[in-house]
């Protein structure tokens, strides 16, 4: 009885802890989209004519899990979901996370999200396009030389009032495979931003650091004076020609770089009177050739056959060699410039656009938009999350992404091992077939050559017969071995030594040998490697 009571208490505690954790996750979760249900009504497709791509509610390949699918190649796509209320990014930690899978790979296309700021009055989700202003853009992008996980903060300059895109420097690369990957951006109150790929930190940066973002959120305190000009007498030459240097008297600037080799002699047998090319004697004028329309017909040229055996034809000329007296154009040696003042640059003045920030002046997030152009289909978005706690994002990664990724990884590993085994088998078969082709040409196997050749050809057409062919060849060898061993021990039959019979026997043997040679199959051409 007491054990039942303890067990009941344990279940109640477990249920309470689970409920508390669930409540905590719900409290810290701003938005979570699993796409378990069709997205119609929650996500609004842009009606802009540029966005012809069709979004579909589809399963991830190999899973029962649904996502938002890019279904067509070479299209622009636009879709948006509004938050129930704008999220203030200035208060505490904010985590942006989502999964994306390139089921057909990714050669050229984007798969990033735009976290839209509140739009102007009159804006509707149906009008979403590339001009719809955002606060943050985050996610993978790959095309040509571009291969990065974007993190772009669009920040309002407090001096000019203009919005400026600040790009994360040296962002992580996009994983190059067809597996599900989860991308996470964590914004901390201390201005730190961390980028995670599959839960692993790939980049840490400070939003206010000029070393981490381009351009920097906080401008430089000083700038070059735009009105400052270089003085006319400012000399930037570190070296100058020596004004006291004199050209040596024996310096010949006109001497050529190369001269004829006077020691060279014409090779013996050189055919001076033979041209290198002659008319093709076998060429004939085409029957439809019209001299008036096509011009005078001339036979095509071929290499002079007489020159093939000779060291050369035509006029012989001495080869050229480097001129030992060549020195080129003389110039004065360089010396340090006594008037050198260094490279001029304008003086620095206080930057009139300088301002200071303790924290970025984030714009609230009012909606999530996907606005991409891609050459690939099969891009699947899933489990889009906005949370206020890193642990919540980690929980979602472990429960939604990790199980799928593990299954996909195991499948990929099995496919790679199978492909490796297939390549190994092909190499093995090539070695076997090359060896069997050589075996088939052995003279003492001439009686069996046709059978061996037939077996090899069948095996080449059906590589899975390789083992069977090897067994068959072994049987042939074994049979031949037995015949040689046991057949050689039989007593020779008595033959009367009669010259006519011997001659007749010899003659018939020669004829039989000739017939056998005639009947033997033609030597098989070596197999071409595939």
Swiss-Prot record:
Signal peptide (residue range): 1-20
Enumerate the GO terms in the molecular function aspect: calcium ion binding; carbohydrate binding; unfolded protein binding
Membrane-crossing ranges are: 467-487
Which SUPFAM superfamilies is this protein grouped with?
Concanavalin A-like lectins/glucanases, P-domain of calnexin/calreticulin
Write out the residues that bind Ca(2+).
34, 65, 382
Q: Which GO terms describe its cellular component?
A: chloroplast; endoplasmic reticulum; endoplasmic reticulum membrane; mitochondrion; plant-type cell wall; plant-type vacuole; plasmodesma; vacuole
**Glycosylation site list:** 464
Stretches assigned to the Cytoplasmic side: 488-530
Enumerate the Lumenal topological stretches.
21-466
Q: Which residues carry this modification: Phosphoserine?
A: 508
Region spans: 4 X approximate repeats: 225-291, 295-352
State the family it belongs to.
Belongs to the calreticulin family.
Function, in words = Calcium-binding protein that interacts with newly synthesized monoglucosylated glycoproteins in the endoplasmic reticulum. It may act in assisting protein assembly and/or in the retention within the ER of unassembled protein subunits. It seems to play a major role in the quality control apparatus of the ER by the retention of incorrectly folded proteins.
| Name of the protein described by the UniProt record | Calnexin homolog 1
Specify the species: Arabidopsis thaliana (Mouse-ear cress)
